[in-house]
Amino acid sequence: MNAQKFEGRAEFQRLLVETLAWAAAQGCREIHAWDASFVDWPLSDANALTALTTWAGHGRQLYLLAQQYEDVQRRHTRFVRWRRDFGHCVTARAVEPELKLDGAPESLLLAVGADGPVVLRLFDRHLWRGEISRDAGARLRALEWFDALAQRSSESFAPTTLGL
C-alpha cells in the first residue's frame, strides 16, 4: 500500500487513536512510539485509553521513546494513571536532548498485526504534515531507526513515584 499523506493536527490525532484501536483489534504484540514529549498526542482521550486497555495483555509491550516525559505527567493525568495500572506492558525510555536527531520524524507510531504493518509518521509539527503507510520496508527502516535511538537512551517515566 502506498503511503497516504495527511495534514492537520486533528487528522494526526485521529490517526493515532485509529492506529491504537487497529493494534488492539489486530492483537499486535508490540507498539513502538516516538515523540520528543508526547504532549500533542491524545493520550488521555477516552478512545485512546480504551484502545490501549483492550490491547494491553499478556505478552504485549508498548515501547515509548521521548526526550522527556514531564509534559505527559503534567498534561495527561489519565494516561499517567493508565501507565501505572499497566506498567507491566510499558517500557519508557528517554534520549538526551543533546542527541542529534537529524532526519528524525517529529512523531512515529509503529505496529504489526495479522494484516501487516502500520507506520504513522509526522514530519512537520508546524504544518502537521505526515503520512500513514502499510509498507513493510518503511516499517523495517523506522524500527531500525527506533532501535538505534533506544540503544542511546535510559529508563524514564516510572510507573510509580516513590516519595519520602
Task: Name every feature range the model reports, one short phrase each.
Residues M1-E30, S37-L164:
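PLD/PLD-like phosphodiesterase catalytic module centered on the HKD motif
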